[in-house]
Each structure stands twice: as C-alpha cells, then as structure tokens.
Amino acid sequence: MKLNPSPTPLSPADYELLADFRYALRTFAAFSESAAAELALTPQQHQTLLAIKGTRKSPSNRRGLYVGEIADRLLIRPHTAAELVGRLARLDLVSREADPEDGRRVEVVLTQKAERLLEDLSASHLEELRAMRPLLSRLLTRIGDDPA
C-alpha cells in the first residue's frame, strides 16, 4: 500500500476522528474475540465460518467457498487458509465437498454444528453493532464533514 501525502495539513479534529474510529473498531474486535473464545473458537476460526456463510457465491447454488476464496476474504495466504480449514474439519465445523460444477475443486461447507455456533455468534454480534450504532453513526457523519 502506498501512502499519499495529505494535500492539506490535518487538523486536531481529524486526528481525534481517526483515534475515535480506531477505538470503536478495536472495541468491536475485542467483543468479537471474547464472544468467539466463549465458544472455544479463535477469532480466525470465527471469521472463516462467517466468510463461508456470508460471502455471496457465484453461481448462487454453491454452498461453500474454495480455500483460495477463504484466503482472500481473511487476507491470509492460501496455505494458511488450508491449514485453518483442516483444523476446522477436525473440530467438525466444516466439511470438504466436491464442487458439483468441477469435480477437481473442493468446496469448504459448514456443518450443522458450525451453523448453530455461527447463528449464536452472529446474533450477539448484530446486537453489539446495534448498541454501537449511535457512536458509529456519529463517527461516519464526522467523516463526511468538511475539514475544520
């Protein structure tokens, strides 16, 4: 990533906005890590389950993701994603199924156990986001404000 110099000096309000936004993100991340840990999941395992369930698939009849797609969604290397999928399979949270369109490829699909865990986790995460909505809305509104 290349950093571009600011065309105008940043104001103290800009730094405050960035600090507040980073704090809100970290607060949510800490909540998420704790919620996953309560169900004996690492944050990366939780993110993987959510990616499999929540990523729009093409064609739409696909039930899972390929390992490479998981790597892309989690911003990790494919071999790291493959190891992660292996650990999730040993925990009976995912299964590997032949792609119905291309038998050489394998889709990673959630098990019923994972579906139940993910539903509980996702419900609590949505509740937390709803609780944070006023703060997030204020921060996002401030991003749209003209510099002071």
Positions of PLM-derived features:
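N-terminal leader segment of winged-helix/HTH proteins
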Residues: M1-L39, L91-L93, R138
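Short, charged, intrinsically disordered terminal tails
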Residues: N61-G64, T141-A148
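Residue-level marker of regulatory loop/turn positions in helix-turn-helix DNA-binding domains and
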Residues: L10-A13, L41, P59, L110
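Amphipathic, non-transmembrane alpha-helical scaffold segments
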Residues: R22-L25, L74, L118, S122
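Pre-recognition alpha-helix immediately N-terminal to the DNA-recognition helix
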Residues: E16, D20, T27, Q47-G54, ...
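N-terminal helix-turn-helix DNA-binding core of bacterial DNA-binding proteins
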Residues: A30-R77
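Charged, amphipathic alpha-helical coiled-coil/dimerization segments
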Residues: N4-P5, V85-G144
